[in-house]
Amino acid sequence: MLIPRKVKHRKQHHPGRTGHATGGTVVSFGEYGIQALTPAYVTNRQIESARIAMTRHVKRGGNVYINIFPDRPLTKKPAETRMGSGKGSVEWWVANVKPGRVLFELSGVDEATAREALTRAIHKLPLKARIIKREEGDA
């Protein structure tokens, strides 16, 4: 699971999900990628589930690149607890994904295999996404 090794503050305010991604919007490491179309919090378990779905489909053929990291803690209070008495304990680590952000990249496989693997990964994620191909001029 992806979680930060060490954080300065254990609990944070919830980040806003408005606006579009400013960086990480092009495929830079692989040949194909998953680009978010809607904003969402993606948990570390969802990232791991999508990664496993891709790697199992491509077997030993390709390389999978993860471009997001769950660096935000989300807290939750226990069930049937009275209001007050502080903020709840950390339950999940999430990545704040905005539209336009490339989440995963894939290289080393043919286009049909890549599209199927990325489609399987999209089904594991809590957002709408599309598959994009690397442009010639991209870094």
Curated annotation (Swiss-Prot):
The keyword Repeat does not apply. GO terms for molecular function: rRNA binding; structural constituent of ribosome; tRNA binding. CDD domains: Ribosomal_L16_L10e (cd01433). GO terms for biological process: translation. It comes from the Bacteria. Residues 1-24 are annotated as: Disordered. Residues 1-17 have a biased composition (Basic residues). GO terms for cellular component: cytosolic large ribosomal subunit. SUPFAM superfamilies: Ribosomal protein L16p/L10e. Keywords: Ribonucleoprotein, Ribosomal protein, RNA-binding, rRNA-binding, tRNA-binding. HAMAP family: Ribosomal_uL16. Binds 23S rRNA and is also seen to make contacts with the A and possibly P site tRNAs. NCBIfam families: rplP_bact. Part of the 50S ribosomal subunit. Belongs to the universal ribosomal protein uL16 family. This is Large ribosomal subunit protein uL16. The lineage of its organism: Bacteria, Bacillati, Actinomycetota, Actinomycetes, Micrococcales.
